[in-house]
């Protein structure tokens, strides 16, 4: 059996798989409903509305609904998309045991302890039928998958089959009765809608579960008489399966095989063979009773709920056993037949038959020797074995078979194969199965794989893959990859892909890592295509991976497949039903990316011109890679506008903005045009958005005063804008006029007076004093003439800023040669311009340059060629003449100015490669390497997935130390900045300063010393520092990894114990110290159960003995004294302990003494948050990093010991860097 997912929660009473998505619902005894994604192992949602245990749960087959029933007598229908309960069905009068949706009708069937089965219409939200007949609790009621039947199981020791065809007919047929017709009432009271077809009796005690077979007329039942029974609806024969030794909780049929699965309160799951009536598999748990089972409606997945959560599992591996037959096809084993599938013919041929299948429970491998046409099959199940088959010729059915024992076997040469035996040796054998050579490897071998070089194999050991030379018996190279599951070589054997559970690593044949990507879904299979692209599959997608790390999705898969080959745009695969499939794929996306990587711009332009862009993702990719000219190939105007702005192409952005005519587009276009100094476009953008203030200022800057004057009359309603315009123009009379229109006559008078407009000032003054009350304002003593500055450049043809010349883009270079002369393969010399020559972007400059070049060419032609001369072809071949001109021998060339030579090509610097920080982050799966690279966010994500880290404040300083310690500053000249040089270890990874030796030294010299001296706060800081530093450590071998794990346990025990002791001391000096003596004694007692060094355990026992003595718990004091004496303390302390022990033996503990929450005879662990004991068998959760124990109520909080991780979070586990010295 294979575990796929496991949860830790309260007791699970009900389970249901979603029919299409990788989800499972679990109803808990605590009253909560949990929705999990078992593929990514994550809790998605919680639903908490029931009061009391929830025993029934079921997904709807097509709608986004599920139904639940609990001990609160309520049936609730939920919508998981809306994340809420839609409605509640009430009618049962006791606990509800099971609920289920009908596959077609809008019905729900429910069973209850009120001895009634009810059928509900969830659309009308009413009960449409009651099934009465059982005289005890009805434990389950289920619909038949196809027929109109219901099966129920009850504690009255019977199983009933109910016929509901009458109910279905009644609910789907319109009755010809009126609402108050007496015949209608008679039909409802005495109609035979539901009848009992069968009542099955045979169990000696109550029946807990009964369910139908998906296709056969069978029923399976589980009972408290420890038996599982198989009933036949058309046959009185009953089969009984015995083996459980406690109540059987649930039983169901395997949907595709002749198997029955049952679970029981005896803490086992058993798989029964219907034919042989015997147990074929069994899962046993030590402390958890099983309560429920569920099977996936479409996949070979099962789930079981137990006391502390649930498990999702498979009975056996579903991966078909296959091996590639070069490029032409694939060999695969189906049942007991070896078959061959030809890619070109698309036909399957049976090769030969074998007598026994290899076990499918372990890891199976198949290797093919194309020269000798031999197939090697190995399995590590049942101790490991291998079989060697030689494919017989067409005219023979005899198969030459050799077999032997070994964990794994692969071909390593034309007539040699390697076997990994149980003794950790690699044995080389010939095709006659005779041993040729035996290689002893100095370290533990986990598995062996084929290698790309002849005479070598790949050896997997711990977190590394080694290449081993069989002849020389030595390691050639290695690569660090954790948990490799599959190794796939390219066709030319130059590249290899390593598939792990979470990563895909590409390397060359020297095992030098090329790239590594993280994959959230388990990679299933993969092959290399002819272009060097790795095509791989997950359970839901077909994907690709380039050697630079770029990856993407090719298409979605309806079911899981295993890729066997790739040719052009066809992917060949085999599914779990052993069917060979040919899948057409669109290779445009990865061919485009590959062409860019190989700088094959012809192919890139072909794809772009044919409009084969997949979507916005490709456009964003090209833009990210530095190809902004992709804007020429985009048709969507908004996307085209955005790309043009990013590329700084104002002309294309302007044309798109005119089509879109959106205010936001014009605003953005105006900002970009202003940056480039494009006056015309800025003017148009401001006009379209009616930003007249900005437009007027623009006119002032460029000196366009005539248009600015027109704006004054245009903005006649806005006095303030007109006044600003008059200030820009320096028009005093217009200013006075505007002030008068605004009623500001005094300001108008002052303006006219100081500008010397005497007549205008007098008329305004008379207007002011005409009422006889107002006086003329006092004129300023000093005044300045407000004249706007004159623009520097008033030439309307030169308002736009000149732009720098740029290099020609890929599309320009390819486009120039589209209809012209074909490019020469030789290097251009002399005055011929190459593709890297710069060109002018200004339209006027480009036209003048072309005219000048045409005029120059025209003049040269007129001087050298006589049009109409019949000999202008020259030579016999019709080539150009090369006649020597006489009389020019003594003439020099000084003074001739070749302007073309002055046109120096702009140097185009090469694109910078990836920095060392990028390489560190890209090539590593360790958080410490990402920290050294400065990629703190990805490091936090890795730590969250590995140890559940959520609080990074305590380790912030370590992040900065690691980041700074991997860089050295190299001083240069005074005028140049310093150079940062990386400090690296092997394989282009940063050097990590934290090591095991440093931590052990600090443990001994600081942490233990402070604890002995009673400086608990100092000791706490030392142990916490060590616990935090372990996350970032690098070690040399697996032994040191184990030492790190021991160090984590030591730090956890000391931190917990010190915190308990500090709280006890805090209570002992508080205002209520006398009232907390009992709690102080409890804390002192808990401290003695921390796994401390004997010298420190002596001190904790002394403290606990004194506390117990003070609160008169003499029996506990005697117990602590006994433990203290057994540790051989110093004589004084031993004498004191003996006195306490003798006194406690003579003096009984008072009966009215306060009882302590402490039982030394019952094993327990201490809750690190509440400091109370968690006795053996009680539910608990742990910190995913330091493994501190907590009560379940503290789930989701930050661990009190390590102060980093989230309590109870499911994680992958800490990965530590191992450096082979």
From Swiss-Prot:
Per the record, which residues fall in region Disordered? 820-885
Which Gene Ontology BP annotations are present? endoplasmic reticulum to Golgi vesicle-mediated transport; intra-Golgi vesicle-mediated transport; intracellular protein transport; retrograde vesicle-mediated transport, Golgi to endoplasmic reticulum
Cross-referenced PROSITE patterns, in alphabetical order? WD_REPEATS_1, WD_REPEATS_2, WD_REPEATS_REGION
Q: Which Pfam families match?
A: B-prop_COPA_B_2nd (PF04053), COPI_C (PF06957), TPR_COPA_B (PF23953), WD40 (PF00400)
Q: Which residues form the signal peptide?
A: none
Q: Which GO cellular component terms, listed alphabetically, does the Swiss-Prot or TrEMBL entry include?
A: COPI vesicle coat; Golgi membrane
> Which InterPro entries does this entry report, sorted A to Z?
Beta-prop_COPA/B_2nd (IPR006692), Coatomer_alpha_WD-assoc_reg (IPR047312), Coatomer_asu (IPR016391), Coatomer_asu_C (IPR010714), Coatomer_complex_subunit (IPR050844), G-protein_beta_WD-40_rep (IPR020472), TPR_COPA_B (IPR056176), WD40/YVTN_repeat-like_dom_sf (IPR015943)
Task: Locate the compositionally biased regions of type Low complexity.
Answer: 844-857
Task: Write one Gene Ontology MF term.
Answer: structural molecule activity
- Record's subunit section: Oligomeric complex that consists of at least the alpha, beta, beta', gamma, delta, epsilon and zeta subunits.
List the protein's name.
Answer: Coatomer subunit alpha
**Native organism:** Dictyostelium discoideum (Social amoeba)
């Amino acid at each position: 059996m294979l575990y796929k997912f496991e949860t830790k929660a309260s007791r699970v009473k009900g389970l249901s798989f979603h029919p299409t998505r990788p989800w499972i619902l679990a109803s808990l005894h605590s009253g909560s409903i949990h929705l999990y994604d078992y593929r990514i192992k994550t809790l998605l949602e919680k639903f908490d509305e029931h009061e009391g245990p929830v025993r029934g749960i079921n997904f709807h087959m097509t709608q986004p609904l599920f139904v639940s029933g609990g001990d609160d007598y309520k049936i609730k229908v939920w919508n998981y998309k809306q994340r809420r309960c839609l409605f509640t069905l009430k009618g049962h009068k006791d606990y509800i045991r099971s609920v289920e949706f009908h596959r077609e009708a809008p019905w729900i069937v429910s069973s209850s302890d009120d001895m009634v089965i009810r059928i509900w219409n969830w659309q009308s939200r009413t009960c449409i039928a009651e099934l009465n007949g059982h005289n005890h609790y009805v434990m389950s009621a289920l619909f038949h998958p196809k027929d109109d039947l219901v099966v129920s199981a009850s504690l009255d020791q019977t199983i009933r089959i109910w016929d509901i065809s009458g109910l279905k007919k009644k609910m789907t047929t319109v009755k010809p009765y009126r609402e108050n017709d007496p015949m209608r009432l008679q039909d409802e009271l005495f109609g035979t809608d539901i009848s009992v077809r069968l009542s099955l009796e045979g169990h000696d005690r109550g029946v807990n579960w009964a369910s139908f077979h998906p296709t056969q007329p069978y029923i399976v039942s589980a009972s408290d008489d420890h038996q599982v029974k198989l009933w036949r609806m058309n046959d009185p024969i009953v089969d009984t399966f015995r083996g459980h030794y406690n109540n059987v909780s649930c039983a169901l049929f395997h949907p595709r095989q002749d198997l029955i699965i049952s679970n029981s309160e005896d803490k086992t799951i058993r798989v029964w063979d219907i034919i042989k009536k015997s147990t074929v598999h069994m899962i046993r748990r030590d402390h958890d009773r099983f309560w429920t089972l569920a099977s996936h409606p479409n996949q070979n997945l099962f789930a079981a709920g137990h006391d502390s959560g649930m498990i999702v599992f498979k009975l056996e591996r579903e991966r078909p056993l296959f091996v590639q037959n070069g490029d032409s096809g694939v060999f695969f084993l189906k049942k007991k037949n070896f078959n061959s599938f030809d890619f070109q013919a698309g036909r399957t041929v049976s090769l030969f038959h074998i007598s026994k299948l290899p076990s499918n429970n372990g890891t199976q491998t198949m290797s093919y020797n194309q020269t000798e046409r031999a197939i090697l099959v190995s399995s590590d199940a049942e101790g490991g074995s291998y079989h060697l088959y030689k494919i017989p010729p067409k005219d023979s059915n005899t198969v030459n078979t050799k077999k032997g024992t070994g964990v794994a076997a692969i071909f390593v040469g034309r007539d040699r194969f390697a076997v990994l035996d149980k003794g950790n040796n690699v044995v080389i054998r010939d095709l006659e199965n005779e041993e040729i050579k035996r290689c002893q490897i100095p370290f533990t071998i986990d598995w062996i794989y084929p290698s790309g070089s002849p005479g070598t194999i790949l050896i997997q050991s711990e977190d590394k893959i080694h290449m081993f030379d069989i002849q020389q018996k030595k390691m050639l190279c290695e690569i660090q990859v954790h948990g490799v599951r599959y190794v796939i070589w390219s066709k030319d054997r130059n590249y290899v892909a390593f598939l792990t559970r979470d990563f895909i690593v590409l390397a060359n044949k020297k095992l030098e890592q090329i790239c590594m990507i993280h994959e959230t879904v388990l990679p299933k299979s993969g092959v290399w295509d002819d272009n060097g692209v790795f095509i791989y599959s997950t359970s839901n997608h077909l994907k690709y991976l380039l050697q630079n790390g770029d990856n993407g999705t090719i298409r979605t898969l309806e079911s899981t497949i295993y890729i066997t080959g790739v040719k052009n745009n066809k992917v060949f695969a085999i599914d779990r039903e052993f069917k060979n499939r040919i899948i057409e794929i669109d290779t445009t996306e990865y061919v485009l990316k590959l062409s860019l990587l190989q700088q094959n711009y012809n192919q890139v332009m072909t794809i772009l011109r044919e409009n084969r862009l997949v979507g916005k993702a490709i456009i964003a990719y090209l833009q990210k890679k530095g190809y902004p000219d992709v804007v020429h190939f985009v048709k969507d105007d908004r996307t085209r506008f955005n790309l043009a702005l990013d590329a700084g192409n104002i002309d294309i952005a302007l044309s798109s903005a005119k089509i879109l005519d959106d205010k936001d587009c014009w605003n953005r276009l105006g900002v970009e045009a202003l940056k480039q100094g494009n006056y015309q476009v800025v003017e148009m953008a401001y006009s379209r958005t009616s930003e007249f203030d900005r437009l007027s200022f623009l006119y002032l800057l460029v000196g366009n005063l005539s248009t600015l004057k027109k704006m004054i009359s245009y903005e006649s309603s806005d006095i303030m804008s007109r006044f600003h315009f008059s200030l820009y123009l320096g028009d005093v009379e217009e200013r006075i006029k505007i002030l008068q229109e605004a009623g500001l006559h005094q300001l108008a008078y002052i303006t006219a007076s100081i500008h010397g407009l005497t007549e205008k000032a007098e008329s305004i003054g008379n207007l002011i004093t005409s009422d006889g009350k107002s006086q003329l304002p006092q004129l300023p003593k000093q005044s300045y003439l407000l004249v706007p500055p004159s623009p520097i450049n008033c030439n309307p043809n030169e308002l736009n800023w000149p732009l720098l010349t740029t290099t020609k883009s890929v599309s320009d270079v390819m486009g120039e040669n589209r209809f012209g002369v074909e490019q020469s393969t030789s290097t251009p010399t002399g005055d011929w311009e190459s593709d890297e020559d710069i060109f002018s972007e200004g339209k006027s400059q480009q036209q003048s340059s072309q005219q000048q070049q045409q005029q120059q060419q025209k003049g040269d032609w007129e001087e050298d060629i006589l049009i109409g001369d019949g000999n202008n072809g020259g030579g016999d071949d019709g080539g150009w003449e090369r006649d020597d001109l006489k009389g020019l021998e003594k003439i020099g060339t000084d003074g001739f100015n070749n302007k073309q030579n002055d046109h120096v090509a702009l140097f185009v610097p090469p694109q910078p490669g990836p920095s060392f920080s990028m390489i560190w982050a890209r090539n590593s799966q360790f958080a410490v390497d990402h920290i050294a690279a400065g990629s703190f966010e990805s490091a936090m994500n890795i730590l969250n997935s590995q140890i559940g880290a959520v609080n990074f404040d305590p380790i912030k300083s370590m992040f900065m130390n690691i980041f700074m310690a991997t860089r050295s500053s190299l001083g240069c000249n005074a005028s140049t900045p310093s150079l940062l040089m990386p400090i690296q270890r092997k394989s282009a990874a940063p050097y990590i300063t934290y090591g095991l030796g440093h931590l052990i030294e600090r443990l001994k010299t600081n942490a233990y010393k402070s604890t002995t001296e009673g400086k608990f706060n100092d000791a706490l800081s030392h142990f916490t520092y060590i616990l935090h530093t372990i996350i970032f450590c690098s070690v040399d071998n697996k032994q040191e990894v184990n030492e790190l794990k021991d160090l984590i346990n030591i730090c956890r025990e000391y931190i917990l114990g010190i915190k308990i002791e500090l709280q006890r001391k805090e209570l002992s000096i508080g205002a209520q110290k006398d009232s907390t003596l009992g709690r102080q004694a409890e804390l002192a007692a808990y401290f003695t159960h921390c796994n401390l060094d004997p010298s420190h355990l002596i001190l904790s026992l002394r403290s606990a003995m004194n506390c117990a003595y003070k609160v008169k718990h003499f029996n506990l004091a005697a117990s602590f004294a006994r433990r203290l004496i057994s540790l051989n303390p110093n004589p004084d302390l031993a004498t004191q302990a003996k006195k306490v022990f003798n006194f406690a033996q003579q003096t009984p503990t008072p009966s009215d003494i306060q009882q302590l929450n402490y039982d030394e005879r019952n094993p327990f662990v201490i809750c690190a948050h509440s400091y109370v004991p968690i006795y053996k068998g009680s539910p608990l959760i742990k910190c995913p990093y330091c493994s501190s124990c907590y009560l379940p109520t503290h789930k989701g909080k930050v661990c009190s010991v390590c102060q980093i991780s989230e309590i109870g979070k499911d994680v992958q586990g800490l990965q530590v860097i191992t450096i082979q010295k």
